[in-house]
């Protein structure tokens, strides 16, 4: 009995280390529902707006906010610190307009429990008996009070701290413009500031950058040559610490990206939560005082105020009301004039594409070099727009390097416009299905795209505070950025629900050829229905064709059946896209085809989870040896397609009723079905 208990205990310890080792990156755009992923202590709390408030305007208090799971900073058995990258947005609102303190720090520590630490100049990291810290730690401090004990250079500086509050290197706070001009930056000015910290383990160099904007500066504010291998342990905790002294400030964290496998993405500052700043309250009091004085001023000043009021009223009348979903999404709402100018009046030259949902335009935001994609919802798709807006209020918080980011929106009367990251290389389907594409994707590029999409789907299913089912995974909704990374886009059909709960049944929406058979039978959503669609994408990338090709030979009509027949006959190379000219990694191609068949199985119990798919693609698991049959059927007897469509992959339907064909073994149903009821185009 005791031996069994010991084995179980060892297994649990192993699984815990395995989970922590898989965590390479995370992203928070606001923290409204992030409390399960954070360890907060001291006076730290999550404000109603979704920002972390580390300290209040109370003297001599501390606050900590750490990611709840440890991060592996060294490979197993190797004493070498790995590279890491993080970006985060902070704001410090002082108790008095020009006086506050003490500051905050990004910290990497052996434990998230620092409750024995002191406030004031120790920033909640150390106490007076631990200045020579025996347990190693690393921090980047944003200090707003000069302390002679630690030889601070001034009361507005950034410093790198290693095992001590006396900075190894520090510099006055500031940032660099694109023309290399350095601008001063006041940390405790109540302004949102973004920070980037990048450690390169090969160069053994640490870079710190600041900016009050979304774009990452090219030049570093601090660049320090250091080997962190002797500082960081195998597993450490990452987070933030702040404190107040005789002077106090409210210290806020508005968003946070962390990455152990590449460069952390920059945060879009307009999309972050608002600061519940006491400065605003003081401003209102000052405005009331000014208003009282202005009543005693001359008739001329009064006339100017009246004219200004009329102008504001007219402008407010022209704007649509702000609804609850907009407040939940975040503060950034683009003006209609701004987006009209960005897209050259929504001109045809800027048109990227159109569909049942409306049109998408390329735009360049005024006063910026940033390109965006602007989706203008058509009036014909007005039904369902309110439902879609309620989804946007949640989906707008999603942030992952393999998702197309929603930057903001605009409402003007009945118009609804959504603003996304611009993807300069278009969608994956153009490269796979166009007869004469300008560029033929190499296998290396295809495999990279597949892994990116899988990572994005894993984040949707498991990595956010709610489970997100995309419901329309297909090559046309995989967009490619400037570096040909695959990003999942078009969340117009997505559904969200709490982890562990039952999403229930819903109407069947999606694209013909990508719908899981159990979805079309019962309408019940699961993450496995997304896995089924991803299986089609895997086979599309390997074979260079759509799931259903009505112009193909009868035996090649249904891609899954065709691939399976070649697999059984040992002619699997025959299905590989001929445009690759045989230049591919055969082991990777076979693995992708195996995974495609597994994900496309009619039985959801056979399909892997996206976490398992990612581990296969990252070669953490060997390629599956046994691939069960996907369940055959005679597609000629089981389909009813419009011959003029050219490809069933172009259908975007929702199914009122469907008659299922039973395969040769008469025990399963196929994903290919004929409609016995009517088919309508879903307004998107």
Swiss-Prot record:
Location(s), subcellular: Cell membrane
Cytoplasmic topological intervals: 314-684
Top enzyme category: transferase
Stretches of the chain forming a coiled coil according to its record: none
SUPFAM superfamilies (UniProt xref): Concanavalin A-like lectins/glucanases, Protein kinase-like (PK-like)
PANTHER family per the UniProt record, alphabetical: PTHR27007
Function noted in UniProt: Involved in resistance response to the pathogenic oomycetes Phytophthora infestans and Phytophthora capsici and to the pathogenic bacteria Pseudomonas syringae.
Protein name: L-type lectin-domain containing receptor kinase S.4
Record organism: Arabidopsis thaliana
């Amino acid at each position: 009995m005791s031996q069994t208990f010991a084995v179980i205990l060892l297994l649990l310890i192993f699984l815990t280390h395995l989970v922590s080792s898989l965590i390479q990156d995370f992203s928070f755009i606001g923290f409204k529902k992030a409390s399960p992923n954070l360890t907060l202590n001291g006076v730290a709390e999550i404000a109603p707006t979704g920002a972390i408030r580390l300290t209040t305007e109370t003297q001599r208090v501390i606050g900590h906010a750490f990611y709840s799971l440890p991060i592996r900073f060294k490979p197993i058995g190797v004493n070498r610190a790995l590279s890491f990258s993080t970006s985060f947005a902070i704001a410090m609102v002082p108790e008095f307009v020009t006086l506050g303190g003490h500051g905050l720090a990004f910290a990497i520590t052996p434990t998230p429990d620092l409750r024995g630490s002191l406030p004031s100049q120790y920033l909640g990291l150390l106490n007076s008996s631990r200045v020579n810290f025996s347990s190693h730690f690393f921090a980047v401090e944003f200090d707003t009070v000069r302390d002679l004990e630690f030889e601070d250079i001034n009361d507005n500086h950034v410093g790198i701290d290693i095992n001590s509050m006396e900075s190894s290197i520090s510099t006055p706070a500031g940032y660099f413009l694109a023309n290399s001009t350095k601008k001063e930056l006041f940390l405790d000015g109540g302004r949102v500031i973004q920070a980037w910290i990048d450690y390169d383990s090969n160069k053994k160099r640490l870079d710190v950058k600041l900016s009050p904007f979304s774009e990452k500066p090219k030049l570093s504010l601090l660049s320090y040559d250091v080997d962190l291998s002797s500082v960081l342990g195998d597993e450490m905790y990452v987070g933030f610490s702040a404190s107040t002294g005789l002077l106090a400030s409210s210290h806020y964290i508005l968003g946070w990206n962390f990455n152990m496998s590449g460069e952390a993405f920059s945060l879009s500052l307009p999309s972050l939560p608002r600061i519940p700043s006491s400065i605003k309250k003081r401003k209102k009091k000052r405005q009331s005082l000014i208003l009282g004085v202005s009543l005693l001023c001359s008739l001329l000043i009064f006339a100017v105020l009246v004219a200004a009021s009329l102008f504001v009223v007219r402008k407010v009348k022209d704007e649509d009301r702000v609804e609850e979903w907009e407040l939940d999404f975040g503060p950034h709402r683009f003006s209609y004039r701004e987006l009209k100018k960005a897209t050259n009046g929504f001109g045809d030259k800027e048109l990227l594409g159109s569909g049942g949902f409306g049109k998408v335009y390329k735009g360049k935001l005024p006063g910026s070099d940033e390109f965006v994609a602007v989706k203008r919802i058509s009036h014909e798709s007005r039904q369902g727009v309110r439902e879609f807006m309620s989804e946007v209020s949640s989906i707008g918080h999603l942030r992952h390097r393999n998702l197309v980011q929603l930057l903001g929106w605009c409402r003007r009367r009945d118009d609804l416009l959504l603003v996304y990251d611009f993807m300069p290389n278009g969608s994956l389907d153009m490269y796979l299905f166009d007869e004469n594409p300008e560029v033929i994707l190499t296998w290396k590029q295809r495999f990279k795209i597949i892994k990116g999409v899988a990572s994005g789907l894993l984040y949707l299913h498991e990595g956010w505070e709610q489970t997100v089912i995309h419901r329309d995974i297909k090559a046309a909704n995989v967009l490619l950025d400037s570096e040909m990374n695959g990003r999942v886009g078009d969340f117009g059909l997505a559904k969200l629900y709490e982890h562990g709960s039952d999403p229930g049944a819903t109407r069947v929406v999606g694209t013909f050829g990508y719908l899981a058979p159990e979805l079309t039978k019962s309408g019940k959503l699961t993450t496995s229905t997304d896995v089924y669609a991803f299986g089609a994408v895997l086979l599309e990338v390997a074979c260079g064709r759509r799931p259903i090709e009505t112009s193909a030979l009868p035996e090649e009509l249904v891609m899954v059946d065709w691939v399976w027949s070649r697999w059984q006959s040992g002619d699997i190379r025959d299905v590989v896209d001929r445009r690759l000219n045989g230049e591919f990694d055969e082991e990777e191609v076979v693995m992708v085809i195996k995974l495609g068949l597994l994900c496309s199985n009619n039985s959801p119990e056979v399909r892997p989870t996206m976490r398992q798919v990612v581990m296969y693609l990252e070669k953490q698991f060997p390629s599956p040896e046994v691939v069960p049959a996907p369940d055959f059927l005679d597609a000629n007897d089981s389909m009813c397609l419009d011959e003029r469509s050219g490809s069933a992959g172009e259908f975007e339907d929702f199914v009122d009723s469907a008659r299922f064909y039973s395969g040769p073994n008469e025990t399963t149903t196929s994903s290919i079905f004929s409609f016995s009821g009517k088919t309508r185009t879903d307004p998107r």
